[in-house]
Amino acid sequence: MLKVKKARYHGIKLPELSIGLDYSDADVQHIFVSHAHADHIPRNRKSLREHTNLAIYATPPTAALMRLRGFKEDIIELPFFETLTTDLFTMTLYPAGHILGSAMAFIETGVGNILYTGDCKTP
């Protein structure tokens, strides 16, 4: 079973996979940013810069908005419907409809799958 920990503010952490979903602490190696609102962009930028093997994922519009807000760290841009594959998981992003570039992440692992919606538009 996939373990999920709720973050203190927004987001969740998947500790077994070292993934933060709208969550950024020094104890994760992968961060997914669902959209470019300030409450979802990684907060502790100093710890991010000191992180040596950190991967930050976002859609191209979200990455562009983050850069406009002064975000200097490298961001791996993952377009909607394309799948990223790592040794531990695959991740595919789908439109969330909240703001430009907002995404839901479908993460598949050997121990379970999760759809992280972040903020999304409902009918």
Where are these regions (language model features)?
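His/Asp/Glu-rich metal-coordinating catalytic cores
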Residues: 2-27, 38-123
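Conserved G/P- and acidic residue-centered "switch" motifs that form tight phosphate/ATP-binding loops
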Residues: 35
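Hydrophobic beta-strand segment of the Class I
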Residues: 31
